[in-house]
């Protein structure tokens, strides 16, 4: 399950296409969103102040992610990244945070998984891996 491309649906909406055997979902139960903006998605470009992401949602067909920007980008070299930013270094800590609560992470996964054979109370999902994709 990796992004295969993107489409600009409007001057402020990017659709990242992600083929999956089941529909995509945003999981905020298994992944902590404390300190995590936009479910792990970021938008950057060459300007010093790229437009902020105003919302992130799963597309109506369940096979893509819709990223809405607050304003149309004015800079070149736009890029969407996912699961690449960790929480800031905690006060007094000497090691960057990691893991599903503080590390670089995202909340997108397949909507159905498989039951783990060694513990039938555990469901294993297909998680969207970290990526960066140029959108200009």
Residue spans for each PLM region:
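C-terminal beta-sandwich/jelly-roll accessory domains of carbohydrate-active enzymes
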Residues: 21-136
């Amino acid at each position: 399950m990796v992004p295969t491309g993107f489409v600009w649906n409007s001057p402020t909406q990017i659709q990242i296409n992600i083929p999956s055997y089941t529909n995509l979902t945003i999981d905020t139960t298994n992944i902590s969103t404390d300190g995590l903006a936009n479910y792990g998605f970021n938008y950057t470009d060459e300007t010093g102040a790229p437009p902020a992401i105003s919302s992130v949602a799963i597309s109506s067909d369940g096979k893509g992610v819709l990223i809405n920007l607050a304003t149309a980008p004015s800079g070149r070299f736009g890029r969407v990244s996912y699961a690449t930013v960790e929480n800031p270094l905690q006060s007094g800590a000497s090691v960057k945070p990691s893991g599903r609560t503080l590390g670089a992470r995202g909340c997108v996964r397949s909507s159905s998984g498989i039951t783990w054979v060694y513990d039938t109370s555990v469901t294993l999902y297909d998680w969207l891996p970290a990526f960066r994709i140029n959108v200009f």
